Amino acid sequence: MNSKKVLGVTITAAALLIAVIQFIPAPALQIPAQLPAEQRDAHRLLNFEGISNFRDLGGYQTADGRRVKWGQLYRAGSFAEASRSDLDNLAALNLATLIDFRSSAEKEEEPNRLPEPANFTVIDIPVLDEGNRNLFAEISERIESDDFAEFDPNQIMEQANRQFADEFTPQFRQFIHAVEDANGQPVLWHCTAGKDRTGFAAAILLRILGVPQALVIQDYMASRQPALDARNRQVVMLRLFKGEETADKIS
């Protein structure tokens, strides 16, 4: 069997698998705020189907002995792959505000899937906007040309994290004001992976609320596995459509 036939069979099999998965009933969404107190920590990572790294920031103890309220502050990754079940389940969170940190390039590449009509306010606070546009263009060009010489995605993200602190104070100040303006109603913020920009925003907010630094770091680091899982899914799709060599250079 030649390579074109193998690729055709692989794509057909993947399409059939996706179609079958669409009809498998999703498990009921476990919302921590609606569970007994002793079960909430175990379900901090909400079991959405197509929204990665969706977490409730409730339950963290502050330095003065209080706790962050469950069901008020949520963080997540992209909604581009949200399932129909996910869109239905979002309503159960009674969100007042959704804050999107993604760049215009990211939103063009993978638009959010949200309930229609959305029963919450969407606020765009793009961080790394022009930088991300350039990065997306570079990655796309490298994938198409199969050229990954001297391309280090980890170095790019380290540089981005430094920029959060040095260059994006107005954006994160706007984020804090948006949370305040929600007047105690549930707020969700997200970027693409729900890790760096979203994590930086969560860290700022938790420190303002008085959560000790050790717990803030613990929450930030909790994004590593969900982000890795999401990246692995992207690599699988690259293997299907671009081949092993291209996928290995990204992974």
What does each model-found stretch correspond to?
Residues 193, 197-198:
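Ser/Thr-glycine-rich phosphate-binding loops at phosphate-binding pockets of nucleotides
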